[in-house]
């Protein structure tokens, strides 16, 4: 089977259900491991299978035929959402729906009034227009924000068309890589991207970098031999979009485009269904709550008004009025702006968020599955340890060269550094003299580059060393003899040569009979061999890649200058050499990672490492960064300590666990769940991309909110499936950036922790904003309710309500997004999405039932004071509504017998509206200050939030402007107030402040008590 059976384009089924089943089946197919057997075929069988001459390539006619049949060699781009759909989602998604319903109801009410009355009031018409405008403006704003992020995304895409060198009809030609077909004979050399999946038929020192596919940072050798059953591990297959690092190779293309291994991963990623974000679910829950309250109030008063004798049509208008009054017009804009501010703050801290809702998702994350290479580590091999003079020395692996130093005076070190510098083909790329050595780019294999940098740092210019000891001959590294050897002219001896050699330590040692100690050659005895073995095991156990080094001074009488050394028919000694030492390399952890992992742990977030690398290396790095914390053991550790076989250890005793990809392959979902449940510290090593996806799904089954980090194409399915996918901005592949929700611009795991902190903070602050905004709903609704029940003149008009919701309340509500955290938010457990809601019943009861009621009292007090000053005592107001609103009544008497015309009555009524509005502003001062904290006293929190202080001043200034600005009486029916009327609501404002401070004091004194259960939101 050549992987062509399931092409992602094959979904054509008549009915939707069948199509869904088909899609699920395909995804399951894609989740399976790669299945191909071309690596097992002999070259003749290969030629027959693909009808190709292995030396001359395809004929042009045959190539054109295959191209027409298979289509171009390119990945199908993931289905993109058209811009108009994105825009409509912003206009009609989530919260906006509530406002649209409100607007439609307003137009409906206006229509009813227009049909019934001769001169209908235009309030409902204004209200409908304003609601629609709010949704449209906010929608445009959110759309613009997301479009900006996706613009940054598009700039990541590399637009350079890739070229490939193919041999057709015996001639080498450069063609566009899209035109490569199955069966083509392709040649790749160091620096090229592999244009398609191909089976190698001949190679010369070829190495490829498979890290984007498997996550292994070491370059892999490629040769025609079939070395492994698994096609991903065998040496004779090269994969599409991996890079050839050095050497050359020829191969036959076995699959192109979406049928390549890389293509299957990309289709797997684009085919996954993405769940809703936690914040979207929260907003839905909130809308359900608010709608519930609104409909309940509306229907209650609808029935009540019918009982009180109103007509059906009047009752319907009341019903609509109450429902609309419950809609918090300003909240949609507030939430959008708060999320945008956080997204901007995160971008400054190197987290680019692609969609606003992901901002909060990161805060509710409870599990992070992190890739190792490049995310937790620096993604550059570095020399970590040396063993010479029978001692292990530590090298410096820090990013800024501030780490350990060792004694460089030993003559043995001089010999070791000379071998590492000479027997080494890596060079620095030109023009980097001003860059620090550790950051320079090199040409060559990762291990050799590490040696080059190490020697350059400790011994000065390697280039000078090589110029003084010119190379005469060399045997490059190959997988059969596992060493690399070169012979150089010695600078200190005008006649002599030195032979230097490095390679796998055990292979080097068996060629040596002597060892260099303190600069003296001594015979290599059993004791030294044991010391070597111990050092080798210790360094290998640290997950490091160990190389051995030896040399031999060639006798000048046998090998004078000008001697013809022959590397093929070896005419010089390659045994009886002198062993000098070991050097070991590792891709070291990034400096900020251990601290970040510690913060995650105290924040209750489980960090799981998922990598394609070796278990030993993975475990060493996991211990280095604290994913496996000190003192925690795996089953293997316990077995080694107690000296018993692994099978006798109870796996539950081990807190840590390293799972090998091959074991994961045979596990059932239940066994995986068992591991995820029972171990707190988990490392998955040697995993394939499909397994990454299975691990993420496993975590989600446990009810976790999962964040996944990754940079390779292999990570994209997991990135897409996770609740929040985090891609790397520098090292990340385009496919992974496409699949992710967030991009770390500096590739640093530590940035995720700041992201989590911002996400948690915005969740807390959104609660505060919502509590603040909802509270003023009660003083806005109650006037209308009393107007219906007690038949009093309307205390607060529609226009004034809009001035509060879209005017005075906006800036203060947004200013709460800038509020600092109350306690250390990184010390608490992640929120449980099932129980810990953004808006819960307790928040509604606090805002509506307690604080809102006090605010309404303040407003009514002011209303009654003004009417009483004008001669209407409260008792006279009951039942006066019909006469009050009747245009033909111009002789309405007040409590003192004075007669009022319709116009005069209305001026007093509108003055009352203005004063009620001013009272709400005054009580909202206190509300804003108490909403700063949910548990602490305001005196503990302080007033450091400058934006909030500005918000207080701004709402007061706006209220004064609306009241005193000339012309407002005509435009908004707002009238100037006497100064004393502003003070009517002050006592209520103080009452709110005192009430809430006492409540919070009880909260802190009796945590978990009755008050907390009933009022802590």
Curated annotation (Swiss-Prot):
The chain crosses the membrane at residues 83-103, 127-147, 284-303, 316-333, 767-786, 797-817, 838-860, 913-932, 946-964, 980-1000. The modification Phosphoserine is found at residue 937. It comes from the Eukaryota. Residues 77-79 are annotated as: Interaction with phosphoinositide-3 kinase. SMART domains: Cation_ATPase_N (SM00831). GO terms for molecular function: ATP binding; ATP hydrolysis activity; metal ion binding; P-type sodium:potassium-exchanging transporter activity. Its main location: membrane. It is found in: Membrane; Cell membrane. It catalyses: K(+)(out) + Na(+)(in) + ATP + H2O = K(+)(in) + Na(+)(out) + ADP + phosphate + H(+). Belongs to the cation transport ATPase (P-type) (TC 3.A.3) family. Type IIC subfamily. Mg(2+) binds at residues 711, 715. This is the catalytic component of the active enzyme, which catalyzes the hydrolysis of ATP coupled with the exchange of sodium and potassium ions across the plasma membrane. This action creates the electrochemical gradient of sodium and potassium ions, providing the energy for active transport of various nutrients. It is a multi-pass membrane protein. This is Sodium/potassium-transporting ATPase subunit alpha-2. Residues 104-126, 304-315, 787-796, 861-912, 965-979 are extracellular. Its EC number is 7.2.2.13. Residues 1-82, 148-283, 334-766, 818-837, 933-945, 1001-1017 are cytoplasmic. The active site is at residue 371. GO terms for cellular component: cell projection; cytoplasm; plasma membrane; sodium:potassium-exchanging ATPase complex.
